[in-house]
Each structure stands twice: as C-alpha cells, then as structure tokens.
Curated annotation (Swiss-Prot):
Annotated metabolic or biological route of this protein: Carbohydrate biosynthesis; gluconeogenesis; Carbohydrate degradation; glycolysis; D-glyceraldehyde 3-phosphate and glycerone phosphate from D-glucose: step 2/4
HAMAP family: G6P_isomerase (MF_00473)
Coiled coil: none
Gene3D superfamilies with a match to the protein in the record: 1.10.1390.10, Glucose-6-phosphate isomerase like protein, domain 1 (3.40.50.10490)
Molecular function terms, GO-annotated: carbohydrate derivative binding; glucose-6-phosphate isomerase activity; monosaccharide binding
EC number(s) per entry: 5.3.1.9
Database matches in PROSITE patterns: P_GLUCOSE_ISOMERASE_1 (PS00765), P_GLUCOSE_ISOMERASE_2 (PS00174), P_GLUCOSE_ISOMERASE_3 (PS51463)
Purpose of the protein: Catalyzes the reversible isomerization of glucose-6-phosphate to fructose-6-phosphate.
Record protein name field: Glucose-6-phosphate isomerase
Recorded family membership: Belongs to the GPI family.
Classification of source organism: Bacteria, Pseudomonadati, Pseudomonadota, Gammaproteobacteria, Alteromonadales
Amino acid sequence: MTLLTQSSTWQALSAHTQNLPHMRELFATDAARFKNMSLSACGLFLDYSKNRATAETLELLFSLAKDSQLEAKIKAMFAGEIINTTEKRAVLHTALRSKASQSIIAEGQDIVLEVQQTLSKMQEFVETVTSGQWKGYTGKAITDIVSIGIGGSFLGPKVVSQALRPYWNQGLNCHFVANVDGTSISEKLKLLDSETTLFIMSSKSFGTQETLTNTLTAKAWFLAKGGLQSDVAKHFVAVTSNVTKATEFGIDANNIFPMWDWVGGRYSLWSAIGLPIALLVGMDNFRALLNGAHQMDEHFASAPLAENMPVIMGLLSLWYGNFFNAQSHVVLTYDHYLRGLPAYFQQLDMESNGKSVTLDGTDVDYSTGPVIWGGEGTNGQHAYHQLIHQGTALIPADFIMPLQSHNPIGVHHDQLASNCFGQTQALMQGRTFEEALAELANSSLTDEEKQLIAKHKVMPGNKPSNTLLMNKLTPETLGALIALYEHRTFVQGAIWDINSFDQWGVELGKNLGNDVLARISAEQDSSALDASSNGLINLYRQGAI
C-alpha cells in the first residue's frame, strides 16, 4: 500500500462511505444545505450541495488535503519551484496572466517582464492586422486566419475563440487545423483566398509532425495559388522557440512569437499561442480573459481550503473516483458557445492526471484520472443522460450555465435553464417505486402491468452533480472558468502525488508513429515488428484489403 492509502484519513473516508444518507434525506433534514454548500468567486457561483457529502465528509477531505501538503504544493507552483520533476521544469502558466507589477523569477530571469513584452508585441501585431494595415502579397487586407497546431496549441485557442464568438471583430474569420489527416486542411483551403489568408504556425520545435506537415501543405497551396517564396513572410507567422527553422521557412523574425519551457502545451492558450484569440476578439478582450484567470489564481492561492472553489471541486471528484469507483466525470455545458469545453477539459485532465506512478516511482494503488467527457445541453438529455440517470455506473456531473444569454430570444433561455436545473434535481432526487406506481394509477394498465412498468421507471437518484453559474459568458468569466478547472486538476494530482505536468504516453505515441512511418515508406523493414503491426503496414502498402 502507498502512504496515501495507509493514512488514517484515507481509511476514515473509506469507512465513511457506508454511513451516508441518500441526498433526498440530506436535503429534507437541512434547510440550509444549499446556503452552506455553495460559494462565489471570481464571477462564478458553485452549488455543490447536490453531492454525496456532509460536513463530516468535507472535513475528512480537507484533512486529506492537509495530509498531502496541498497548500505547500500550491505555494511551490506559484513560486516557480521545479514541480515538474521528470522534466526538471517549473510550472508557471499562472505567470502568463500575472500583473505587470509582479516579479516571478524562473531560470534566473524575471519572466513577467518577458510575458509583458510578448503581450505588447501581440498587441501591435493584432492592431496591424485588424486595422487592415497588414497587407497580403497583392495589397489586400487579411480576412481569414488559419491557426495550425496540435494538442494545447490547437484546442485551447479553438475552444476559447468559439466561446467568445459574440466578441469577434467584424470582417475577420478564423479556421483551426490540427489533424494530420489531409482531409482536414484540404477542406479548409477550399474556402480560402490566398491573397487574404494569414497562417499562424504554433510549434515549440517548429518540427511537430502534424503541425509541420500541415504548414508545408499550406505553403505549397499558397505558392500554387500565385504567391512567391518572397511573399511567405506576408502570409505566415509563427509561435515557436526555434527561430532558425522558422526563418528558414520564410517567416520574418519580427513575426515570430516566443514559447517557454515553463509552459505546458495544455496550459498555453494564455501565451502567444492565444494569438488567434487575440486577433478575433481584440487585445482588450484577450487581456480580460487573462485577468479572469488571474483572479482565479489569486483565489486558489489565498482562499482557505473550505472556501476554495478549485479545492472543493477537486476533492469531490477524487471522493467519487477513489471511494465510489467512479471511472468517468461528465461536463455538461448549457450554453452553445461553451460546447467545446468538455473536449478542452478532457485534454486538460486526462493528459495531466493519466498517470500510474507517484513522484518517487511507486506504483499507485488507487485510481487516478477519470475519463472526462460531455457535451452541450439540452442535446445530451436525449442521448447519454439516460445512462447517468439509470445506468449502473456512478457518473458525477458538472453543469455549467450563464444566467444571461447573448441571444435572448423568446423563451429559449428560460427553457434552457429549467432543463439544466431540472436535470440536477432529477439526478439527486430520482424516482422511487412508490412514486412511479402512483404516476400509473390512472392508466389503463392492469395491476400486474403497473407493477412491472413501475420497476422500469424507478431511478435511484443520489447521483452527484455540481452546478456552475455566471452572470454572462464574458472573456473574464471564461478565463476564471478555465483556470478553475486547471487548478481543480492540480489539486487531484497533488493529493495523488503524481506529476500532472509531463506526458510520456504522448511522447511514446509520437516516437512509435515516426518509426512506423519510416517502415511504411520502406526506409526500414517492418518484419521486425509484432505480427499485427507488420500485417497492418503491409495492408496499407498494398492499398486494399
């Protein structure tokens, strides 16, 4: 057993699961439950009263956090200590949204100064493009941005841009390309005019396979449409650490934005990786996004555990995963603009906490990262909500909704809100056999049929959920929301004593993919591989089954 599972607090939590009343009873016996189990921070409101938790549960979870030195680990991250121990790196995405007056030293340098310089450079670039001063090779202004990246350099900008659609600058559109499948970029290029398109290539090394392949394809398309090599600088910019490769490609050194080792890809949207966001919504709104995240950083760093929103959410998720065998967690966004958030949080959480050894290399004997999934309401209510209500697996849920819509048409938002709140109530309350039978009392069914159908209509309830509200979806509230989930992820990793900031599984996949590519192109013999891989490669070479 690990030290974590041997601890008296862990054992107490395990025993405590046997003594919890149904949530129906918890609400019936405590009129102040909603008031006592909700809080506001940074423009967000969290109702966590619909959880399988009592005051005793929370005290035990806070004790577990203290036993795990959570507060010290939070301070270590903000101080720039080397908490990514396997790669010997600080973890300072929080510095990207810090105030200009702050000073944070990493690798012997004040990185806040570097961040502010980059923001100033971004501002100048954004203003040049959005004002129409930036001209393409035929003298026309830019109308379309194509952001080429993969992982965090793709998903973050795409999801945030999608969420902030009401704030987009008129006359500018953005397209996102990530997958190396040629269909992805081909379909995008069909829509574009080479004279008015600007490509942003985001890759720390300027050599990431998918990103480089797509960028080379974009360049070939540009040249085929009439652009010259000397025109590339007018239509391609880069976010990269490899200035040499970028300039060799044809990008002007003045149009290369930096990336830093102390920022992981899945935490990078706050950096120059967020350039597509800034182009679409303007730098004022981009800075508001950063400010919302900064407010959540300050809340996370200073609020007591019992009043700390990321801590509470992280502990409750851990509670279900480690003590109720919940293998997944669903994120349900009741706002069309936020429909991409489940995929973003999926990458954030699963790439961070999909680990099986502790920091000292000991195999864990407890579940770590759950499967994160979800979608937008109310669509999911006619699909996978059925599994959450009556399936055999426990699936904790997060419901996210703005109180005010950007598009207040008729009764749409009232119906959306009623569905959101109704779902959380149904999950908590369920339906007993007696209630189901009573609903059938006036039907034409026989008594025997009523008994049978009632059994099918029973829902156990006691299904946990959090509800996150904001007044309105703005750059600031979105920044706070994303930072909330970043820190929630950190909380769990800190208690599990794992490294939430490396991704060796991703690296292995990259390496093996490159190896297979060499064998597909016949540069290497594939017969040395396992029979399955060799057989698949041979089928691919044949081009037919």
